[in-house]
């Protein structure tokens, strides 16, 4: 079981997504699966990022609602670093 840590950016991003009317239980469900060390089902399109973000992973909570996260195995920590739309997170 991983301990979940939230960056300040993640906290702000989550507040914004809640304000936009997103079902936050979906985010909680994904985080709980990840914290339990389970693989996400294929519909979440979980994948490793590349380039400057190569140490992070991304999954799709909804088609345009993403979660960026990172595992730290040395202390069994899952760090949630951001959530939002593609535009919010990557400026695209």
What annotation goes with each model-predicted range?
Residues 33-60:
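A short, surface-exposed loop/turn module that caps and links secondary-structure elements
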Residues 3, 9-12, 19-24, 50, ...:
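Enriched for short, Lys/Arg-rich terminal
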Residues 16-19, 36:
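Secondary-structure boundary motif
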Residues 31, 45, 76-78:
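N-terminal hydrophobic or amphipathic segments with adjacent small-residue motifs
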């Amino acid at each position: 079981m991983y301990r979940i840590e939230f960056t300040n950016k993640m906290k702000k991003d989550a507040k914004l997504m809640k304000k936009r009317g997103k079902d936050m239980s979906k985010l909680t469900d994904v985080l709980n699966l990840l914290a339990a060390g389970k693989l996400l089902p294929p519909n979440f399109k979980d994948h490793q990022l590349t380039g400057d973000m190569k140490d992070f992973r991304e999954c799709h909570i909804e088609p345009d609602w993403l979660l960026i996260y990172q595992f730290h195995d040395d202390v069994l920590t899952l760090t949630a670093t951001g959530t939002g739309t593609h535009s919010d997170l990557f400026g695209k």
